[in-house]
């Protein structure tokens, strides 16, 4: 355990909350102290849900630890059933409550409530949020789903969408439309939008569509074994992946692999003349493994970017991500420490970052364009408009989202040609972003030589005064540095300063800049 300002995943009980909140007719009783009762904020503020999540807390306090916390939990279960009358109850403990080792499942069973009780045992100090969601959905399926007669029409279940998921609402709509167009009915969407009664009829479908492996792969594997339902392995993010998904679904359903591509614009937008400036742009990707693997394929094969780095924070999927990274000649970064991610980005100096909300913060600090491709996300990534990531419309949305942060081709040429112009300068940012442009810095006045000194003895102008041996840049070197493209300028500055420090120099001139360039080019 370590202290951090940011975490990509919460503890496992947050994953359980995401499953419970996405469902209807299910109530989650969480054994937790007062400090762990923050679910309302997560779902009502960030996701803008119009109702509170179906979660009740025991909210035990310090004084309860000297008495019977088991009774506190059982009373919370009774109250939750009497007040909400759910079809099923899910019980578990938060990371803090796990320390007192109350048997929440046994305590709930002892009440003999007239509804099914789903037990959760989530190892809070070994696993995290996505595992919690995956395990919770698995236990719900084990408890409620039974083999049953198949539907007359070929049908499938859509598995994986949860509350607080990245564009899950719109992805479900897009994929449902795609499946219906192929003549395949959707039996149940779960966990989001389903009730315990719906879970009970999961077995009626002929196969399962697994949209989000992080939150439903265990349930899909269980259904394959217990309910004899195969499941899809392709996640339909991007044009190529969506076409592969259609072919896979058609094979499972025994239908023709047909799809309406009339709304698909991404391939032409990517190939049009105005998009030639995208070719070869260096991009770094980080997020959950599913979205990163899909995004890397889009970036290289469909948009023409160069993938220079990729990684994920969920260690459960480190193996498939490492395998995918090898296809790009890369070593995957597997970490849940945002500082390591920031170091990797600084070292690679990409032109675009595709990541989570944290990478958006990193990009802002480093002055690099960024687009969000994966949870965790903040409130602005739960848009009011229809904005899927999956299917053909998702491919259109992805193209617009990724391209928007970049400076367009013509403007890049203007920046190169008129670098000191009042309108086209590096600090102004892309003109299509709106907001007030930062005025170009006024040219620094060059220092004059001391009286009586000859031109040869004149001291070159200094960009900043040195203090206590600090390395400073002379104005001519600073001006030369600005000729380097802005997306690699930071790396050039760091390398030059490192070179100067190794040589014992306190002032960097043009000569130092080019010596450093030659040194690191070897």
Curated annotation (Swiss-Prot):
The active site is at residue 274. Residues 426-464 are annotated as: Disordered. Gene3D superfamilies: 1.20.89.20, Nitrogenase molybdenum iron protein domain, Proto-chlorophyllide reductase 57 kD subunit B. Pfam families: Oxidored_nitro (PF00148), PCP_red (PF08369). Keywords: 4Fe-4S, ATP-binding, Bacteriochlorophyll biosynthesis, Chlorophyll biosynthesis, Iron, Iron-sulfur, Metal-binding, Nucleotide-binding, Oxidoreductase, Photosynthesis. The keyword Cytoplasm does not apply. Its EC number is 1.3.7.7. PANTHER family: LIGHT-INDEPENDENT PROTOCHLOROPHYLLIDE REDUCTASE SUBUNIT B (PTHR33712:SF7). This is Light-independent protochlorophyllide reductase subunit B. It comes from Cereibacter sphaeroides (strain ATCC 17025 / ATH 2.4.3) (Rhodobacter sphaeroides). The gene is bchB.
